């Protein structure tokens, strides 16, 4: 019975990926005209979601990929808004940019006890409080936002009002409230950024974006 569905059980992982990428390149019109480094990121995100329209919604502003790679080579800190991002990032891949990377270089304060208490006492979201706690490390850092739009908006305000300059902002919060607005605000910042417009996003996409950027490093 299962043979009717033409499932190819014996395909190795590399062949599956290659065939998937070939399908994306057949179906995504005009990819050849994109900068190769940006296409690597876009293709990975399309591959992660099986959604070709993801590519049409991505904005690359202020040379984000060279800026991110330079920052990673100097062992910059990484701030993220969810524990899923912190757990999903590959330290092994980060060490391709700098051998000193460890899990402790990936900062996420969303579950910190002091953040929970501060949010409760002030009536604000934990996401805002966590972004404020990370304020001392944001200048020159890589920022990955895949969940909380208010975290993205707070960091955008730091950039606009205080001159804080992350080396990269990945702006991919997801949802229905404050999401579009936070992305539009980020777009006004003179900061290297990769932003997915609209309501779509997610922690998995933020992780995929940084991993895809690392693919632009020379093979070791």
Predicted regions and their residues:
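Electropositive, gly/pro-rich neighborhoods at or near active sites that engage anionic ligands
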Residues: 1-79, 87
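Short, ordered loop/turn segments at secondary-structure junctions
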Residues: 83-84, 111-113, 148, 172-175, ...
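C-terminal functional extensions of proteins
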Residues: 167, 177-220
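Long, charge-patterned amphipathic alpha-helical coiled-coil/hairpin "stalk" segments used as oligomerization
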Residues: 118, 124-182
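Long, charge-dense
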Residues: 94-138
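General beta-strand structural signal in soluble alpha/beta enzymes
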Residues: 78-80, 108, 144-145, 194-196
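Buried hydrophobic positions in well-ordered alpha/beta secondary-structure cores of metabolic enzymes
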Residues: 81, 170-171, 209
């Amino acid at each position: 019975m299962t043979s009717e569905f033409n499932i190819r059980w014996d395909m190795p992982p590399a062949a599956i990926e290659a065939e998937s990428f070939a399908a994306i390149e057949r179906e995504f019109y005009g990819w050849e005209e994109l900068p190769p480094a940006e296409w690597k990121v876009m293709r990975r995100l399309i591959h992660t979601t099986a959604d070709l329209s993801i590519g049409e919604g991505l904005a690359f502003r202020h040379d984000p990929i060279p800026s991110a790679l330079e920052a990673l080579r100097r062992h910059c800190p990484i701030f993220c808004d969810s524990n899923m991002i912190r757990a999903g990032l590959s330290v092994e891949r980060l060490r391709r940019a700098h051998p000193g990377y460890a899990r402790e270089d990936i900062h996420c304060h969303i579950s910190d006890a002091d953040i929970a208490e501060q949010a409760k006492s002030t009536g604000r979201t934990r996401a805002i409080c966590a972004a404020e706690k990370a304020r001392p490390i944001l200048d020159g850092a890589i920022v990955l936002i895949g969940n909380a739009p208010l975290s993205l908006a707070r960091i955008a305000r730091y950039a606009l009002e205080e001159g804080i300059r992350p080396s990269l902002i990945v702006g991919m919060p997801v949802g229905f409230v404050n999401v579009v607005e936070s992305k539009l605000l980020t777009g006004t910042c003179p900061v290297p950024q990769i932003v997915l417009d609209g309501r779509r996003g997610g922690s998995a996409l933020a992780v995929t974006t940084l991993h895809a950027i690392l693919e632009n490093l020379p093979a070791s």
